[in-house]
Amino acid sequence: RFVSAIGEELSHGEAAALSWEVYFVLRGLPAMGMDFDLGKYFKSDELNALWACEDLGHYLKRSASTLSTEPADVAVALLQDLISTADAAAEGKADATVQLRFGHAETLMPLLSLMHLRGCYYLTNYFDTVALHWRDFDIVPMAANLQMVLFKTAKGRVYVRFALNERAVPLMPDSDDTVIPWSVARNYLLR
């Protein structure tokens, strides 16, 4: 719709390139507080196709895939630091009761993939299905965050709860439990 509204004859490649450029500019306007309707320029199926292509790019660049685990592997040092910090807290050796780290989507996506959190880790050879199972806007919306909260019982047992974007998420692939013993979580994360 957008390209035909210009009124010029464009090759398929020119039309695709122009659509991408306009999409990349316009999609960011609402995040800047500008009230804007992308539907004015693109049909919903066109918008979905453009987003799915962008989503696939994020998936291939920042998550484990059947092509490479390298995007997730870059987060190994961060995960090891999270584990050692949690170990110190569990053993009562941490000076702080809260540890905060700040990063961007480009930091969180690899970490979440490495941790195999549900919805953040998806392997397939059918890349046209990625947008059905791995959605960047669910994984790292604006102000995305991962919480790892440790609890210690009166008997000294330590449990952990993970929350992604303020929602409790199970860590273990075969369980819906959102609070699990730290030792179980630790062993799983070190696999």
What function would you assign to each model-found segment?
Residues 1-99, 103-191:
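Signature for phosphate-centric chemistry
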